[in-house]
Amino acid sequence: VIGGDECDINEHRFLAFLYPGRFFCSGTLINQEWVLTVAHCDTISMRIYLGLHTRSVPNDDEEIRYPMEKFKCPNRKRSYIKDKDIMLIRLNRPVNDSPHIAPLSLPSNPPSVGSVCHVMGWGTTSPSKATYPDVPHCANINLVNDTMCHGAYNGLPVTSRKFCAGVLQGGIDTCVGDSGGPLICNGQFQGIVSWGGKVCARLPRPALYTKVFEYLPWIQSIIAGNTTATCPL
């Protein structure tokens, strides 16, 4: 996260650190057995850390899990990595609530333009060079209207399944290593860090987020056992 500060150790109990090997991502624990992230973070081998704050110093209640099952949209365009950028991971074993682990509820309402949103992750803190912090960083940004979002990504398919968030003056943004992490707007889990401009935190391109609310039927169907459910078009 560019332009943020170290997260409070107690404000990200749902934040998962995904370590696929060559790079890393984040995810969000949505119940004791499921983590929600983005499809472009998928790799063959992956470790999932829960209850993590300082990467070099484990918490007493830190847990490590592995994917038992991974679900991406069956109607996703495989030739276009940014299409339907969402993935559900079923953990090999459930986790229990603890001082540093607790799930985040899915949203009950869609996001609204202008909302103040909170983003977090272990991604680089510098837009010009890879500077990965030992602790997650948090920042506040705003949900941007669709007209501005489409204008920033002219020619790219910015759909109703995505939205933009950032700050108009630049300088605060998600970046490399933050993919898959949550965007929490007005207390609700509304977005998943997906992708952005070639240079983070630079105008006029706020980052793009997968809109969780649009995928609620798919998420709920998969968790309920309907593993052939399709995503919205």
From Swiss-Prot:
Organism: Bothrops alternatus (Urutu)
Recorded family membership: Belongs to the peptidase S1 family. Snake venom subfamily.
Subunit-level organization: Monomer.
EC number: 3.4.21.-
BP GO annotations: proteolysis
Domain Peptidase S1, residue spans: 1-224
Keywords: Disulfide bond, Hemostasis impairing toxin, Hydrolase, Protease, Secreted, Serine protease, Toxin
Top-level taxon of the source organism: Eukaryota
Location within or outside the cell: Secreted
Role noted for this protein: Snake venom serine protease that may act in the hemostasis system of the prey.
Active site, renumbered: H40 (charge relay system), D85 (charge relay system), S179 (charge relay system)
Name of this protein: Snake venom serine protease BthaTL
UniProt note on tissues of expression: Expressed by the venom gland.
InterPro entries: Peptidase_S1_PA, Peptidase_S1_PA_chymotrypsin, Peptidase_S1A, Trypsin_dom, TRYPSIN_SER
Any one of the GO CC terms: extracellular region
